Amino acid sequence: MRKRLLAVLLIVCVMAGMLYLGNENEYVGKEEEISTLFRDKETIYFWYSDEALTDFIASAAVAFGEEKDVRVIPVLTSDSEYLEALNQASLHSTQIPDAFILSNDSLEKAYLSGLASRITDEAGICNEEHFPGTALSAVTYKDKLVAYPYYYETSALLYNKTYLEAWTAEQLQKVAEGDGEEGMDDAGEDAADASAADNADASATDDTDASGEMEATEDTLTVTPEQIAAGIPANMDEMLAFADNYDAPENVEAVLRWDVSDIFYNYFFVGNYMVVGGECGDDETAVDISNEAVKQCLQVYQNLNQFFYIESDSVSYDSVVQDFIDGKIVFTIATTDVLTKLKQAKEEGTFPYEYGIAMLPGPSAELQAKSLSVTNCVVVNGYSEHRALANEFAAFLTNEYYDNLYERTGKVSANLAANAGNEDLQVFMEEYKHAGSLPKMIETSNFWIQLEILFSKVWEGEDAAGLLQELSDRITTQLQ
């Protein structure tokens, strides 16, 4: 225990003196002092740019240092010109960043500049036993694993479970009374089918479930989780049918509202059919932007504005989440951070509802959804003189020290074994498994800004086919 306390104190003292590097001169000025302090043990420097990770990385550094009898010095660096700072420190400092966290879309630039190197993966963790294919593709460049997957972000469907449960009960009651099937929408029919199956099971077991609670009787009707799930729209056709038939509570302003100004929450409409860089995002020949399926998806997207009337210049992700907390909307598109916001609202007493997370709806019954994802990874610096130890720490961080990563940092581990007991995060993981990744190609670094502009214009009624062709021509030219 005494050794652990001394190690923590030592790390804190170092971090207080030099962790945040406001400029290169300040960092270089600390080099001699730090080198003297840690000359007794092999030492590696670990860079990151997100302050939310500070306490967690410091704890991981202490744990790994004690296990291996080495020193890991975390270095928080401004994310402004992060790669350039890494490059300068690698070329001109005696304290080279041995490993660092980087978004997958910057891996080509890092690899070509020598900052990223092929990982050794001595622990044998970079496989589908430990990470989904999406994560492995994200850290692959030109058929080489050049990083370890660490944490990810993607989007999923967030719904007000309280509202949906009440609506499902109404649908089931109509079926029970024999007067609601004719006008029932697709989602309602699914809920009714689930009800019939559940009630049949209930009859076969004396009308009780495994816990002894009554499933259905003449006087009461209990809605099961399966029936609620059956009522969640699987595509936008079902979403529109739901909206047409939904008898909304007084404070509900919209059935569906999301941030239509941000490509991260729009991409799922076209993600399954738009190709930029191939599976690993590094193939200049794999580009297919303007095809019939993408055009159909964008037409669906454009038509939704006629139904949901979302003003792109006045909506934001934060405003949508607040509307959801206030009970003004039934469904929205959200990223993993929403779980923390809802938990906080619950604790403050401002969110009196239950909620659920589901897979994103397809654009139509025939067209499939595919969300966008970003994978932050741990890179071993090609300039490092301690690459073996840096690889060990990267493997430790991504495959051993992931417990409570989300609770302490808000970041969701890409490791399949993480968050096993969190149902909401497991749904996000399922979405991540099927998601597309940001491409790594330097020439397409502005693609997402251009695609976001395209979505904005399509939402406002401009010709989708023409805009797609313009974007396709522009990206093709950039890659030549």
Describe each PLM feature range:
Residues L240-Y246, D283-V315:
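Glycine-centered hinge/linker elements that transmit conformational signals in sensory
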Residues V146-Y150, S155, G183-D201, D206-A286:
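Extracytoplasmic/periplasmic solute-binding protein
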Residues F46-D50, V72-L136, P149-Y159, A230-L240, ...:
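Ligand-binding clamshell of periplasmic/extracellular solute-binding protein-like
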Residues Y45, Q306, K346-G410:
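Extracytoplasmic/periplasmic substrate-recognition and gating elements
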Residues L102-A156, W167, E182-D186, D190-D193, ...:
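Hinge/lid segment of periplasmic solute-binding proteins
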Residues T120-F131, A229-G231, V276-L298, K346-T350, ...:
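Short, solvent-exposed loop/beta-turn-alpha elements that line the ligand-binding surface or hinge
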Residues G22, D403-N404, E423, E430-Q480:
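Conserved C-terminal helix/tail region of periplasmic/extracytoplasmic solute-binding proteins
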Residues D50-V72:
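Short, polar/charged alpha-helical segment
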